[in-house]
UniProtKB/Swiss-Prot annotation:
Gene Ontology biological-process entries: adenine catabolic process
The organism's place on the tree of life at top rank: Archaea
One Pfam family this sequence matches: Adenine_deam_C
Protein name: Adenine deaminase
Protein source organism: Methanoculleus marisnigri (strain ATCC 35101 / DSM 1498 / JR1)
């Protein structure tokens, strides 16, 4: 069936004559795909390069939470993302960060109050309040958080494992969605209590397979896809929301329901009634696929115009605060003996487990039991470093470090020896922000000039350098996607235990705890 487009919108279906006509015979036309929740910064790409990459995969709208750059740069970071987004064909719609810092325990580069967010209200491209991570603040009536929620009609959630009456109270307070579900019973409870459930498939947060049974013809309108945190190499290799559609269909979901989640359901969740469907009056945002089951995107159209590669557009990067003091090996030495708290990495998830191991500090690293040292360095005020123990990185030598460390984005490192940890941290500081793998004098690195979070390089070069980092880390024995797991080690709003610039943090107890049990 033919359809016509005028001034960026679909005018109708039937026979129309146009100044330019496209023959799409034999292909399938699908509404432009929508990512319901993403941190663009996690791709390690500046917004223009991110747009180039995901547009090629049929995505025409992303709902972005810029809380990574906001934690580093404050309100100017949000201004940067809005301005950069306005320069791309991709619609980058912003949910304002609700928790900067993520918790009162986090030491980042900025604090954003309700008054700070109020100036963005009504600004073009701003659609609501992003994931409310401070669950205790909601439940116990934090006044500034309440004021932030009152600014916006659309409020996203972040409530891993929240259940029962606490979940009731969280929803009653005005939170409408969650993207943190990792198990089917949790997702069902939240859906039955009226929340939108965003099924997440990121580089390490791979929840689609486990949550797919949630979706059927009745529930699909309340479910959508989100990538949350997906590195550039995964975007280039596996895709974006098109990847979620393919995985859902191969997992047994009807293609119509998968496409609805990727389009109309996501648009409806955010009140974007101008997109998400091919209908008169809607934006002419659509992609062309070879087959709905394989769903290989061939072409993408934005407001009726085919999106072509406009070439590399160097970003005007915000300054990256970097006042970290590179530690001496003695600064990160631990002492003691006994039952130690050890952070266990959970493959395919960003949650961790709080383990207990008998440990003699003199025997760390313990390569036989895969117990390594994890270090977090304050990059904003040079106040020092915190040390914890981690199981699951599998490094047999060397160290990895980076300035991408949710949500405060201090410098985080894991290594099989103090000297290499120090070298890796020193390389990140030298770069002014970035990722590094170090083994002796052998160093592989990726500079992240934009706030220590995003690269100023074209996406294909970022993908190449990421591959070099991964290969170097692999030779040292590291787990796959080590930098994505590394980036979540200090995230104090995801259970069970973390490490910050102060030391070990118990998420359930919501407090700092000693490394060795007393």
């Amino acid at each position: 069936m033919d359809f016509g487009v005028k001034d960026g919108r679909i005018i109708g279906f039937g026979e129309y004559r146009g100044t330019r006509e496209y023959d799409l015979s034999g292909a399938y036309v699908v509404p432009g795909l929508i990512d319901a929740h993403v941190h663009i910064e996690s791709s390690l790409l500046a917004p223009a390069e991110y747009a180039r990459l995901v547009l090629a995969h049929g995505t025409t709208t992303v709902i972005a939470d810029p809380h990574e750059i906001a934690n580093v740069c404050g309100a100017p970071g949000i201004d940067y993302m809005l301005a950069q987004g306005a320069r791309t064909p991709l619609d980058i719609l912003v949910m304002l960060p609700s928790c900067v810092p993520a918790t009162p325990f986090d030491a980042g580069g900025a604090v954003l109050t309700a008054a700070d967010l109020a100036r963005f209200r009504g600004r073009e491209g701003v659609v609501g309040l992003a994931e409310v991570m401070n669950v205790p603040g909601v439940l116990f009536g934090d006044e500034d958080l309440r004021a932030k929620m009152d600014l916006f009609e659309v409020v996203d959630g972040h409530a891993p494992f929240l259940s029962g009456k606490d979940l009731n109270a969280y929803i009653y307070a005005g939170v409408q969605s969650d993207h943190e579900c990792t198990a089917l019973p949790e997702a069902r409870e939240k859906l039955l209590r009226g929340m939108y459930v965003m099924i997440r498939e990121g580089s390490t947060e791979r929840n689609l397979h486990d949550l797919l049974p949630l979706v059927d013809a009745c529930t699909a309108p309340r479910c959508c896809f989100a990538t949350d945190d997906r590195h550039a190499d995964m975007l280039a290799g596996e895709g974006h929301i098109d990847d979620c559609v393919r995985k859902a269909v191969s997992g047994g979901l009807e293609v119509e329901q998968a496409l609805r989640m990727a389009t109309l359901s996501a648009a409806g969740r955010f009140g974007l009634h101008d997109r998400g469907a091919l209908a008169p009056g809607r934006l002419a945002d659509f992609c062309v696929a070879d087959d709905p089951d394989r769903f290989r995107v061939l072409r993408t159209f934005k407001r009726g115009v085919e999106v072509v590669d406009a070439g590399y557009l160097p970003p005007a990067c915000p300054k990256s605060p970097m006042h970290a003091r590179v530690p001496e090996p003695g600064d990160i030495r631990i002492t003691g003996r006994g039952e130690a708290r050890v952070i266990e990495i959970v493959p395919g998830q960003i949650t961790t487990r709080d383990l207990r191991y008998p440990v003699d500090a003199a025997g760390i690293p313990d390569l036989d039991r895969d117990i390594l040292k994890a270090v977090v360095i304050d990059r904003y005020r040079a106040t020092g470093s915190g040390v914890g123990l981690v199981h699951g990185f599998h490094l047999q030598e060397g160290a990895i470090a980076g300035s991408v460390s949710h949500d405060s984005h201090n410098i985080v490192a894991v290594g099989a020896g103090d000297a290499d940890i120090v070298r890796a941290v020193a390389e990140v500081v030298r770069l002014g922000g970035g990722l590094a793998v170090v083994s002796g004098d052998d160093i592989t690195a990726l500079p992240l000039e934009c706030a220590g979070l995003m690269s100023a390089l074209p996406y294909d070069e970022v993908v190449r350098r990421l591959a070099a980092l991964e290969e170097h880390a692999r030779r040292l024995g590291a787990i796959a996607n080590p930098f994505m797991y590394l980036s979540f080690l200090a995230l104090t709003v995801i259970p069970e235990v973390r490490v910050t610039e102060r030391g070990v943090f118990d998420v359930g107890a919501f407090t700092d705890v000693p490394l060795f049990e007393e």
